[in-house]
Regions:
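Active-site-proximal alpha-helix that buttresses catalytic centers in soluble enzyme cores
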Residues: 3-69, 114
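Acidic, low-complexity terminal tails and accessory targeting/binding regions
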Residues: 1-5, 65, 80-91, 132, ...
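Generic structural signal for well-ordered alpha-helical scaffold segments
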Residues: 37-41, 120, 124-132
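Amphipathic, non-transmembrane alpha-helical scaffold segments
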Residues: 53, 116, 120-124, 160
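Short beta-strand scaffold positions
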Residues: 50-51, 121, 137-138
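Phosphate-handling substructures
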Residues: 26, 65-122
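Short, active-site-adjacent cap segments at secondary-structure transitions
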Residues: 15, 56-57, 79, 142-145
Length: 192
């Protein structure tokens, strides 16, 4: 069995920026779609999968249509669930609680939210279903969880890569169990 190549594309900026958007269904700025389509046009894709949240799904619809490929929505590619913090500006959250979360999202998840291990587990399951030459339009947290699953990096290690809006992360998935892989490309927008 050969290695599979998959590409993870972070959705474009949401309409309201600067908020913790986990499962909050905030639409993206649709104007970003042409740039995102241009970014993936050369990838020889066969499949397009997207998170079911609007900020990813709407852009996935445009990309799949432009490429003439079917689209599959998969809620396992959603962002981390921020629970009671979902949709809030970080400044409105208790600084000590937010700091504990960023330092250790496993032991200090948001109130009513998802642990890091839960995000990793659902993304791991989603990765296992991917076919080669697949584009997944998703969220930064899910992309970081995929990196953690495939490379063994912990939650601190995956933050070493900047994954801004519209970042395209290309991965080679090795056959076998457990899942493993390597980063083979990262494309982001030029610095402003």
């Amino acid at each position: 069995m050969n290695a599979r190549v998959v590409h993870l594309l972070r959705h474009g900026p949401p309409q309201r920026q600067g908020l913790l958007l986990g499962h909050t269904d905030e639409p993206a700025c649709v104007s970003d779609c042409p740039e995102m389509r241009d970014r993936v046009r050369h990838l020889a894709l066969e499949h397009v999968v997207t998170s079911d949240l609007a900020r990813a799904a709407r852009q996935g619809e445009h990309i799949a249509h432009d490429l003439g490929l079917p689209l599959r929505l998969d809620p396992q590619w959603r962002e981390l669930d921020f629970g009671a913090w979902d949709g809030l500006a970080p400044q409105s959250i208790d600084p000590a609680a937010l700091s504990r979360f960023w330092d250790n999202p496993e032991d200090h998840p948001p109130p009513g939210g998802e642990r890091w291990s839960d995000l990793r587990a659902r993304v791991c399951e989603a990765i296992g279903r991917l076919e080669t030459r697949t584009l997944v339009i998703t969220h930064a947290g899910a992309m970081r969880a995929a990196l953690s699953v495939l490379t063994g990096l912990d939650h601190r290690g995956v933050w070493a890569l900047d994954l801004p809006y519209r970042a395209l992360l290309s991965l080679r998935l090795w056959p076998g169990s457990p899942l493993s892989g390597q980063v083979i490309g990262l494309v982001t927008d030029s610095a402003p």
